Amino acid sequence: MKTRMGRVRPSVAVALAFACGACAFKPSGYGALAQAERAAAQAAAEKESAPDTPGMYLALIDRMQRQGLYYASLAHIDAYEKQYGVTPDSTFLRAQALRDTAQARASAEAYRALLATPLAAQGYHGLGLLAGAAGDFRGACRALERAAALAPTDAATLSDLGYARLREGDVAGARVPLMQAAELDPKSARVQANVVLLLLAQGRAKQARTLMDERQFTPAVRAAVRDDAGRVAQAARAFKIGTGSAHDGFDARTSSEGNDQ
């Protein structure tokens, strides 16, 4: 819904552009594929020296993170900021690395620091991923909705929002963002995994199996999707009961007001 709330974990690491700027970096998301999409850490750290321009250095740090070298990337972020100063891009990369090294509180602080910058969408996205990782899918939905409002065509954000809504039990609310994500980025394995999860939640098991066959999902990914489908089904039952109770309460108040008259 890898959404990182998105490297979300199927979540799933998305190839990032090396150019610096407001749209240079994106959090990876979560969902049925997040773990499967993480690149394995390199056997040996890269030996190339630090680039001599800010853009090249940020590109190197980003590449290290995509290779799973999160601790090393934190050291290089420190070096970058010592040489060039703190920037929104370096803060975003720090937030990502902190999240991927199980430093959730520090990661959240870094993501929040982005909210008043051109990378506010990435900040909300990251906060949503952290909330989802902590099991707070209602909070994840709120943060991801803000992210999607700021970046309405970002497929990863929409996919993570749809996944978070599924985990919150709001199957109907998950449909539109997931369909948007599927059309915006039809080749994304993470998006397709979350669409399969939606189909299962809608009771369309045959279509879900067909899509998994077409996309050649591995047995491990299919098992992850099935596990998530069970959680979504349980959440959907609770969501239905909760919304039904809310409607009953409204009707009761309306009836009471009518009787008073």
For each of these PLM feature ranges, what is it?
Residues S49-D89, L93-D100:
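Alpha-helical segment of the N-proximal tetratricopeptide repeat
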Residues P54, T87-D89, A120-Q122, F137, ...:
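Helix-start (N-cap) detector for alpha-helical repeat units in TPR-like alpha-solenoids
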Residues A17-A43:
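Bacterial Sec signal peptide processing site at the extreme N-terminus
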Residues L93, G126-L127, D160, N194, ...:
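Canonical tetratricopeptide repeat
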Residues P27-S28, A32-A36, V195-Q261:
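Terminal, low-structured helical/coil segments at or just beyond the last alpha-helical repeat
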Residues G68-A75, D100-R112, A134-R146, E168-P177, ...:
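Structural signature of tandem alpha-helical TPR/SEL1-like repeats
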Residues Q83, A116-T117, L150, E183-L184, ...:
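Structural marker of alpha-solenoid helical repeat scaffolds
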